[in-house]
């Protein structure tokens, strides 16, 4: 019973960490990386499709992404979707190939992205703490129903705190790596 609660909490905290990784990957750095375009949706075949499902995205060089549409008729729609996204990118089309140069980040935009990364990391920490709170509430409920002793509850709460501390440290580490990446010139 206690192990199920801890295991569930650990899984949910792990999902929060995965969400953090996805969110941090979508924050643009000076280098070209296909995940930057994950949020771009392209109107194709009657619905909005993620860009990575309608085109192949590759890194051409450190500052350029190369996009080749699976269907050449979608090239114009892909280019327009990238331009209208809030990423501040300006694609250029050459036949069926679309190149997306990554503009160099100014000091101001670096600081803005760093602030955004800190906000995303703080949201992840809050999510991890909410999972801990839910698990502690379940433990308290079991103790109140006399299904576990107070000692078992306290021991499980201490173990939950250790698990939480580990995940918070992982969040801090991911943020540190992203900040270093953002501030590298």
From Swiss-Prot:
One of its GO terms (molecular function) is ribosomal large subunit binding. GO terms for biological process: cytoplasmic translational termination. One of its GO terms (cellular component) is cytosol. It is found in: Cytoplasm. Pfam families: RRF. Keywords: Cytoplasm, Protein biosynthesis. Belongs to the RRF family. Responsible for the release of ribosomes from messenger RNA at the termination of protein biosynthesis. May increase the efficiency of translation by recycling ribosomes from one round of translation to another. HAMAP family: RRF (MF_00040). This is Ribosome-recycling factor. It comes from Ectopseudomonas mendocina (strain ymp) (Pseudomonas mendocina).
């Amino acid at each position: 019973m206690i192990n199920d609660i801890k295991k569930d909490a650990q899984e949910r905290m792990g999902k929060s960490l995965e969400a953090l990784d996805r969110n941090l990957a979508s924050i643009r750095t000076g280098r070209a990386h296909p995940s930057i375009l994950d949020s771009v949706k392209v109107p194709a075949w009657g619905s909005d499709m993620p860009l990575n499902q309608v085109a192949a995205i590759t890194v051409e060089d450190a500052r350029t992404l190369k996009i080749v549409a699976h269907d050449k008729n979608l090239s114009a729609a892909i280019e327009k979707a990238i331009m209208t996204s809030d990423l501040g990118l300006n694609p250029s089309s050459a036949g069926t190939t679309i190149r997306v140069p990554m503009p160099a980040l100014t000091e101001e935009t670096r600081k803005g992205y760093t602030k955004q990364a800190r906000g995303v990391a703080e949201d992840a920490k809050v999510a991890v703490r909410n999972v801990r709170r839910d698990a502690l509430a379940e433990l308290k409920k079991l103790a109140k129903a006399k299904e576990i002793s107070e000692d078992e509850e306290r021991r499980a709460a201490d173990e939950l705190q250790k698990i939480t501390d580990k995940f918070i440290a992982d969040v801090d580490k991911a943020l540190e790596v992203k900040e270093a990446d953002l501030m590298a010139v």
